[in-house]
Design a protein with these regions (language model features):
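N-terminal beta-strand/beta-hairpin edge segment
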Residues: 2-88
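Short, hydrophobic/proline-enriched secondary-structure or compact coil segments at domain edges
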Residues: 2-4, 32-36, 55-63, 102-105, ...
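Short, surface-exposed beta-strand/loop "edge" segments at domain boundaries and coil↔beta transitions
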Residues: 9-14, 39-48, 63-72, 110-115, ...
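Residues that define the transmembrane beta-barrel architecture of outer-membrane proteins
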Residues: 14, 79, 123-125, 155-157, ...
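Broad, structure-driven detector of short, well-ordered beta-strand segments within folded domains
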Residues: 16-27, 45-50, 90, 129-131, ...
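Hydrophobic, aromatic-enriched interface-forming segments
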Residues: 75-113
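Short helix-loop boundary/capping segments
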Residues: 97-141
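Extracytoplasmic/luminal low-complexity segments enriched in Pro/Gly and acidic/polar residues
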Residues: 138-219
């Protein structure tokens, strides 16, 4: 067992512990592998981690992320409900995210989002999230003469979390690229749960779209 601590937000350290058990058979595939149990407050996640010099994998993670842990990640007023993680797996190498799958469930509740000196309230519906790795086109790389010798456009992948209602109605999308930039799109269906919101449009239409560094989320 080992203890860990990170500063997820200024002056708000998050601490916990991790238990691991080596799985030496992963060495046959050129990777170190271990089963892990990660705890922080009431958060408890179990899965398998594999890695080498150029890639890492987090496989078959299950458990829950508790409200007290979420409160250390973001400076928002949060619902008193854990996020349940089911069969979540992610693989990443130098080219980006290669594969991702799994789901999450959140019962929702009252959320307060501070911005511009004000706190905006929204009553989050019950949400489901599905994880995938989606391709994103990257501009071809030119050589010293300004000529691209390849006829193929380079491809990268982003980690995609699609948020829906339990009835599979779209609420929003989060895309995280290999440079830790996050793209957020939120729909009319989600935003109309905010009392101060007066926007109009089709429920599936995107009404908020932002791109920012992952490290600035929740500050």
């Amino acid at each position: 067992q080992a203890n860990w601590q990170i500063n997820a937000r200024p002056n708000t350290p998050m601490a916990g512990s991790v238990d691991w058990r080596w799985q030496p058979w992963h060495l046959l595939m050129g990777k170190l592998g271990m089963a892990v149990d990660i705890r922080s407050g009431k958060t408890d996640l179990q899965g398998v981690v594999k890695f080498n010099k150029t890639s890492w994998q987090a496989n078959d993670f299950n458990g829950k992320i508790s409200p007290d842990t979420l409160a250390q990640l973001v400076s928002w007023q949060l619902p008193d409900a854990p996020i349940t993680i089911k069969e979540m797996s992610i693989e990443k190498n130098k080219q980006g995210y290669q594969t991702a799958k799994g789901s999450m469930n959140w019962a929702g509740g009252d959320l307060g989002y501070p911005t511009g000196g004000k706190t905006y309230l929204i009553k989050l519906p019950t949400m489901q999230g599905n994880l995938s790795a989606d391709k994103a086109s990257v501009q071809p790389i030119a050589n010293a003469n300004g000529i691209n010798n390849s006829n193929k456009t380079a491809q990268g992948k982003s980690l995609h979390l699609a948020l829906t209602t339990p009835q599979a109605e779209r609420l929003g999308d989060f895309y995280l690229d290999q440079d830790n930039m996050i793209d957020v799109s939120l729909t009319q269906r989600l935003l109309k749960n905010m009392p101060a919101y007066q926007g109009k449009g089709a429920d599936d239409s995107v009404v908020v779209s932002i791109r920012q560094p992952l490290t600035s989320m929740g500050n």
